[in-house]
Regions:
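P-loop NTP-binding core
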Residues: 1-251
């Protein structure tokens, strides 16, 4: 049974793209069939998987120009990629006039979903039409949360949006899990945020936490996931552990 997971948080800088790239690669390394759909116009997940951002076909062409989804997918050693590009930045405006505009991504992924065990969608850091498409296409959401004061405020906005989507567009949308990122267990703030997140989401919070790690920050500039850049660092260990926990929940 295929599963589509949107990795989403409208707050930027929380490790969303880092999580999408590294979780997808780690799950692929466990023998699963994986597609990463880069739905962020910054296209950082595309380059993070080793794919050139200037690729001729991508998710924009699928949504706006009717390109077949399979023809836009690129295979990499870390999993397949449906790439993004700067052109996607204007797609929200172009989609406004289109019929069933909130379901365009769902229709695109339906063409290939049976070919994969898991499809991970890297969402833009906002709650507009692109993200709405991801929420309508997904079976579940994975929410990265940084250990800082404003993190909980952003979660409240996201959950309000999820309630609206469930009510009228995707009633079965589930919370896959909540992931604490850039976590520093030496600080009271990180510990307090973790306690609040666990109080709110309970068992949905992964026991795996992603630490602050320089090697994680370096890996994108080397256009590869952390497990291919430095398998022996703390960041790689964390994402491998997350993949194991993720797969155990989905066994």
């Amino acid at each position: 049974m295929s599963k589509i997971i949107a990795i989403v948080n409208q707050k930027g800088g929380v490790g969303k793209t880092t999580t999408c790239v590294n979780l997808a690669a780690a799950v692929k390394a466990k023998g699963k069939r994986v597609l990463l759909c880069d739905f962020d116009p910054q296209a950082n997940a595309t380059s993070g998987m080793g794919v050139d951002k200037s690729v001729s076909n991508g998710v924009y062409d699928v949504l706006i120009n009717g390109t077949e989804t399979a023809k836009a997918i690129i295979s990499t050693p870390y999993g397949d990629v449906l790439p993004s590009s700067k052109a996607l930045a204007g797609a929200g405006v172009e989609m406004i006039e289109m019929e069933n505009r909130q379901f365009l991504l769902k229709a695109a992924l339906r063409q290939v979903v049976e070919q994969y065990d898991f499809i991970f969608i890297d969402c833009p850091p906002s709650l507009e039409l692109l993200t709405l498409n991801a929420l309508c296409a997904a079976n579940s959401l994975l929410v990265p949360v940084q250990g800082e004061y404003y993190a909980l405020e952003g979660l409240s906005d996201l959950m309000n949006t999820v309630r609206i989507v469930r009510r009228s567009m995707n009633p079965s949308l589930d919370i896959e899990g909540v992931l604490l990122t850039m976590f520093d267990g030496r600080t009271n703030l990180s510990i307090q945020v973790a306690q609040e997140v666990k109080r709110f989401f309970g068992t949905k919070v992964y026991s795996t936490v992603i630490p602050r790690n320089v090697r994680l920050s370096e890996a994108p500039s080397h256009v590869r996931p952390i497990t291919a850049y430095d398998r022996n660092c703390r960041g790689a260990d964390a994402y491998i552990a997350l993949a194991e926990e993720f797969l155990k929940r989905n066994a």
